[in-house]
Amino acid sequence: MRGANRTGRPFTGDYAGELLYSTLLEFGFASGVYDRRPDDGLTLVDCAIINAVRCVPPQNKPTPEEIATCRRYLTPAISVLPRLKIMVALGRIAHESALRALKRTLAKFPFAHGARHPLTAAGLSLFDSYHCSRYNTNTGVLTEAMFRQVFASVRAELDRMDVQAPVLG
């Protein structure tokens, strides 16, 4: 077992976690030190990580049925975040799962790395990023700079709002 399956904390113990947590630390969404262990002292700050798919399927490719099954956990997890202003979808599956959980039409909000999608009149927005997997970074689909730019945009928007808000992963 590797990553979150081994450690019990999302994105912990694999390359995706190294990139995600270093970025969260850089932009003030985490404090402490990330050391690939759930007891490393890292603390999320005004942010939450909620997986659209709760298990790691074979070849990291969940079936539509697995995605739909996990949505019954995603929808209530989002609904209990009263201060939620921004969600960050790490990949198309997270993007589509978040939209479906919020009962939005996928065609109105196409996935695009770096895109910002206003979702509600109350100011909830969804930002898109390619997933921070080793595969995406090794193939050049996603660079560290591209990933950090998404979180720089999120931080800038939150600073304009003068609020802190959770992030969806």
Predicted features and spans:
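A polyanion-binding, active-site-adjacent surface
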Residues: 1-163
